Amino acid sequence: MITDYEWPLWQTTALVCGIDEAGRGPLAGPVVAAAVIFPRWFRPVGTILERVNDSKKLSAAERELLAPAIRNAAAFWAVAEVDPETIDQINILQATMLAMNQAVAALPIQPELLLVDGNRFRTELPIPYETVVKGDSKVFSIAAASVLAKTHRDELMVAYASEYPQYGFERHVGYPTRAHVEAIRQHGRCPIHRQSFRLRQLGEKP
């Protein structure tokens, strides 16, 4: 992927920021968002960053290779987490919006334009934004943000696996796999599980 989407925007706007999240669907762990600003007129042609894509289309090894390259090439980047307790309090959609806003606020400079994956966004900041459906497959900056968010969250979940080894977080990173649901059936939920995410497989009602 290259920066074709950003180039027309860079004609008038220097600080274009891509935003994406990871972790809306899991039963455990935080939702994570990343915000990435590349230098104006940046082109990844001829570099490893040509391989940047929607994090879901990349293998774990590819993401781990690309993440440090993205951080090195970016002018600015930031990552933010919203914990399971907050997700339970305000719901996953609101928690995702909060994480995205926190990631932007954590940047050392205020962007001039936000490019957000998806079809909805609610900003707490006085910054113009565009939502881009399937933006992580179309917009380089958003795809890069998706890789940073995903790798950051996966690292957190692998760390949690040593604290709660009975759940196998290092394998499914909190997603509702059959093995994860069975572990919850056997051991109940642990402190990083989202209590508001109910499981029909266990006879739980919404």
From Swiss-Prot:
Cofactor binding annotation: Manganese or magnesium. Binds 1 divalent metal ion per monomer in the absence of substrate. May bind a second metal ion after substrate binding.
Top EC class of this enzyme: hydrolase
Entry GO terms, CC: cytoplasm; ribonuclease H2 complex
InterPro entries given in the database record: RNase_HII, RNase_HII/HIII, RNase_HII/HIII_dom, RNaseH-like_sf, RNaseH_sf
CDD domains associated with the record: RNase_HII_bacteria_HII_like
Gene3D superfamilies attached to this UniProt entry: Ribonuclease H-like superfamily/Ribonuclease H (3.30.420.10)
PROSITE patterns according to UniProt: RNASE_H_2 (PS51975)
Ranges of residues in domain RNase H type-2: 14-206
Biological processes annotated in GO: DNA replication, removal of RNA primer; mismatch repair
Record-linked SUPFAM superfamilies: Ribonuclease H-like (SSF53098)
Location of this chain's protein in the cell: Cytoplasm
Principal place of residence: cytoplasm
Keywords, ordered alphabetically: Cytoplasm, Endonuclease, Hydrolase, Manganese, Metal-binding, Nuclease
Catalytic activity: Endonucleolytic cleavage to 5'-phosphomonoester
GO molecular function terms noted in the UniProt entry: manganese ion binding; RNA binding; RNA-DNA hybrid ribonuclease activity
Residue sites binding a divalent metal cation per the record: 20-21, 117
Enzyme Commission no: 3.1.26.4
Cofactor: Mn(2+); Mg(2+)
Function: Endonuclease that specifically degrades the RNA of RNA-DNA hybrids.
Family: Belongs to the RNase HII family.
Protein name in UniProt: Ribonuclease HII
Originating organism: Pelodictyon phaeoclathratiforme (strain DSM 5477 / BU-1)
